[in-house]
């Protein structure tokens, strides 16, 4: 018969029994279950976190097999949110999982964040509008929000709290205006994706070993991704979720970040005062934009 304290007893030593109880009572919201989100959810479940709000509107496909938790021959065409819910419940039958199978929207955002201790961002890289809305609401509600993006065979992490630099101030996104043409709106979107990538990963370690840059197509909303980066992202992010919940251990908060790249044997702590307005970031933005323009031609 399942017993929570027996199931997670091997955590004790790294955690105290009181801390394990605290994790049992913790609620996390996970936005997006493709890519890193499934891994984040499962690692949190194995830490003993027992309350989840999870959101994804997509189903598994063959193209997910190389990297996504839950993707296998038996789950093709099945809702990602259902598969991850089932996986969490098989790890911890006492867990509570609220499944937002239609995804996150401005209409259900407050419900998604209700009672949440930490928000885990794993939305699709191209879902900027709802990502911005979630981070904005988290700041208003005082909910710590954390993102760890897989970058090649490494991961880059940022934490936003009530006392850190805000998500909007850090990334410096540009909003399209009603007067903009369709071409201008597309360009603004592409530029904002670049801002997000260089903001999450200021050191851009992954650029040194990308073998075929023609596979990076922002306008087609398609970028390469491999499993090692996903697994590393889950380890880094969930370790910091633990620190946020238990309020121990040093936190690296925006405009500071952390990038670990297993391929390059590098661990880099980044610091970008003023976020993407920092001169280094402006230089990186212009460089990547020029490379993409050259690639398109």
Please give the residue ranges for each predicted region.
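Phosphate-binding loop/pocket of nucleotide- and phosphate-handling active sites
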Residues: 1-14, 243-297
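A short, basic/flexible loop-to-alpha-helix module at the beginning of a structural domain
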Residues: 2-28, 223
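Hydrophobic/small residue at the entry helix of a nucleotide-binding pocket
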Residues: 36-37
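Glycine-rich phosphate-binding loop and adjoining beta1-alpha1-beta2 segment
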Residues: 49-92
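A structured beta-alpha segment of the ubiquitous adenosine-cofactor-binding alpha/beta core
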Residues: 77, 81-118, 122-131
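ADP-ribose/adenylate-binding Rossmann-like module
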Residues: 118-161
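A conserved mid-domain beta-alpha-beta active-site/ligand-binding segment of alpha/beta enzyme cores
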Residues: 167-229
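Mid-domain beta-loop-alpha active-site segment that forms a flexible
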Residues: 222-245
